[in-house]
Amino acid sequence: MYRIRVFGDPVLRKRAKPVTKFDDNLEKTIERMIETMYHYDGVGLAAPQVGISQRFFVMDVGNGPVAVINPEILEIDPETEVAEEGCLSFPEIFVEIERSKRIKVRYQNTKGEYVEEVLEGYAARVFQHEFDHLNGVLIIDRISPAKRLLLRKKLMDIARTVKR
């Protein structure tokens, strides 16, 4: 199982590098990430959240775990909705975030094969959240400065726990 990196850890702010090697090592890492995600009752976990600055994440929105490698968002529906999101890198913080209701995506599976699909609702939301992590974008970047200010003390408390 991996240790979850929390707000304040520099790896969370980096743009992750593409995966180029599809091997047993990647599969083992993904299995371990799935185990970590389930242990912490998450529905998604991006590689940077476990200290790996590479472009992949795992998610499970009720249909079993999926590994998403080198993802791209091909189309974003202009229709959006606001819903509450949490993040394993922000313990006990939940914020309202506006996201597209429907997206068309392409990514690679663990064998390096391309998968293209349309995601809607909760699956689209989770994908967008995890995709943000690969670009160094965090949930607090998607809220107003006023709301961020209200969370300042909690954020500072979380950042103090980061092992330097």
Swiss-Prot record:
Catalytic activity, reaction form: N-terminal N-formyl-L-methionyl-[peptide] + H2O = N-terminal L-methionyl-[peptide] + formate
EC number: 3.5.1.88
UniProt-listed GO biological process terms: co-translational protein modification; translation
GO MF, one annotated term: metal ion binding
Listed InterPro entries: Peptide_deformylase, Peptide_deformylase_sf
Cofactor(s) essential for the protein: Fe(2+)
Residues noted as binding Fe cation in the record, renumbered to the chain: 87, 129, 133
Active site, UniProt feature: 130
SUPFAM superfamilies associated with the record: Peptide deformylase (SSF56420)
UniProt KW keywords: Hydrolase, Iron, Metal-binding, Protein biosynthesis
CDD domains: Pep_deformylase
Bound cofactor: record note: Binds 1 Fe(2+) ion.
Family named by the database record: Belongs to the polypeptide deformylase family.
Function field: Removes the formyl group from the N-terminal Met of newly synthesized proteins. Requires at least a dipeptide for an efficient rate of reaction. N-terminal L-methionine is a prerequisite for activity but the enzyme has broad specificity at other positions.
Record protein name field: Peptide deformylase
